[in-house]
Curated annotation (Swiss-Prot):
Family, per entry: Belongs to the MraZ family.
Top-rank taxon: Bacteria
Subunit annotation: Forms oligomers.
Native organism: Ruminiclostridium cellulolyticum (strain ATCC 35319 / DSM 5812 / JCM 6584 / H10) (Clostridium cellulolyticum)
Domain SpoVT-AbrB: 5-47, 76-119
Encoding gene (name): mraZ
Name the record gives this protein: Transcriptional regulator MraZ
Cellular localisation: Cytoplasm, Nucleoid
GO biological process: negative regulation of DNA-templated transcription initiation
Annotated keywords: Cytoplasm, DNA-binding, Repeat, Transcription, Transcription regulation
Molecular function terms, GO-annotated: DNA-binding transcription factor activity; transcription cis-regulatory region binding
Gene3D superfamilies: Transcriptional regulator MraZ domain (3.40.1550.20)
Amino acid sequence: MFYGEYQHTIDPKGRAIVPSKFREGLGEKFILTKGLDGCLFAYSSEEWTSLENKLKSLPFTDKDVRAFIRFFFSGATECEVDKQGRILIPQNLREYAALEKDTYIIGVSSRVEIWDKTAWEAYNSDENISADKIAEKMALLGI
């Protein structure tokens, strides 16, 4: 389980430090891919395999399923943590998430998300994503 929020920077070579608590759960090698809301998602190999199996069980004939699978898997890459606890974020993923220097690395249950600092702060200030509104929606779902 991943939780918490950490600020880090990406160096000029595109490397970012993965917080030690997240490295423990992700492992030395993990999958990084395009996420939703303009961020990147990181999954442990085990979680990725589980997610892959769930997605493979969806009806391939559904256009939206195919589109999501293409989006999700075409951006995926295996990352390896170096001795300094860093990963190299590929250029295409840095461009997708508009990652330049300042980032937030956050834990979200079964995955880690990497956000551009400005995008994360804008997301958190969005009135449609207030804690009260989210709580109301969760209550409707029985949570």
